[in-house]
Amino acid sequence: MVTTNAPIITLRDVRFTYDGGATWALDGVSLDIRRGERICLTGPNGSGKSTLSRVIAGLVAPDEGYVVLSGNVVFDESGAHADEYRTARCGIGAVFQHPEDQIVTTVTEDDVAFGPENLAIEHDEIGLRISGSLDAVDMSDYRASDPTRMSGGQQQRIAIAGMLAMDSDVLVLDEPTAMLDPQGRADIMRVLDELQDRGTTIILVTHHADELEQDRKSVV
């Protein structure tokens, strides 16, 4: 595992509400995440885990606080900074609870290529990334298949493959193994272990006790 002392992600006194302040999904959250760390977000339903993961992924801005993503100050006392958010998101890959929402085409390899294409990766490199990421999630045989007609577990694997193909420095995963059997979960955890060993920063929302290992920081 490769870690550095300087945080790659910083949150200070972050607050987020869905109802204009009647209740707060996040209320005064402060957190530092360093390059190469694996952070597990855990807790009961409704505790704000998914909201926090979306703030860390740069998909939503908080109502209050200070947020640095991949070295970019994306939110401070003056509000959200759109250019900094765009820059930060280029280095963050994400998979969320409903993989069908991340399926954007009717051909698996095209779906996996979507992220790298938006990053203007060269065509030959994209092909290599498609092959490698589909192999990593054991979906190589479905390269030409229609992901919209797949099971939830298969769609979850395709969403993870698309994230892997982006080769991001930071990965945010919200219950990425929820629809997988024990062997499938173990396979995905092995992939994440390998990525962390290469210095990738991983933020994982999970309810699974076996994913909360001693060498990972847990936020409850």
PLM segments and residue spans:
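Helix N-cap at the start of a conserved alpha-helix in ABC-type nucleotide-binding domains
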Residues: 182-184
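Conserved ABC ATPase "signature" region
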Residues: 124-142
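Catalytic Walker B motif of ABC-type/P-loop ATPase nucleotide-binding domains
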Residues: 171-174
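The feature captures the beta-strand-to-loop junction immediately N-terminal to the Walker
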Residues: 42-44
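Helix-to-loop junction immediately C-terminal to a conserved catalytic motif
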Residues: 57
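Conserved ABC transporter NBD signature motif
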Residues: 65-77, 88
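Conserved ABC ATPase signature
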Residues: 146-150, 154
